[in-house]
Amino acid sequence: RVVSSFISEEQAEENFRQELAGVKDLEEVKAKAAAAWNKQLGKVEVEGGSEEDKATFYSCMYHSMLFPRQFYEYNQAGEPVYYSPYDGKVHKGYMFTDNGFWDTFRAQFPLNLLLHPEMHGRYLKSLLDAYDQSGWLPSWSCPGHSGGMIGNHAFSLLADAWVKGVRTFDPQQALKAMHHDATDKAPFGQSIGRSGWRDYYLKGYVPFGTTSEPTAKT
């Protein structure tokens, strides 16, 4: 039996107590995992189609739930805590990682809002926590800023959720973060913030030769 923690050895022991203490064998773990997945996949009932179609649907649904990854743990008091990859400190609350928004902002995250509204609300708050801790919204977290993925796709998640009634984050804080990232480029990472932003606002486009990927950024 192996456990881990991003926080401390003591927290790893606590994770073991919460997740594996009292578990008899691998079959029990397997059964609990199957029950957990059935609960999530059971949120959608498919009608019509062949058995192969249903298998394809639920396989895709399963894959849609693999990211973003949970990056928080529960302490002895049952409170969510996490080691932040953005400032190197331990904070109370929720944090998620391993998402590059590579078209997930178009469909997966709106789907998450429908199927997992509580988790999605926590995820949105974690985006702004990352901004508070690092000065920038994540563009590709792995587990902190990886520097990849052009565009500011976190903007669309925050706007979409607010329009649909999610209130887990401060809209003024979100607006501040979006304005900041739309009018500046981080001194680290290729795609954190918005490179070429000045040319775009002055000329209406990002010209070739001044920054990478000008067509996509325009």
Give residue ranges: language-model regions.
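Secondary-structure capping and boundary motifs in well-ordered enzyme cores
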Residues: 52-53, 94-103, 146-154, 217
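Acidic/polar, glycine-enriched structural segments that form the non-catalytic walls/loops
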Residues: 1-95, 136-137, 167-186
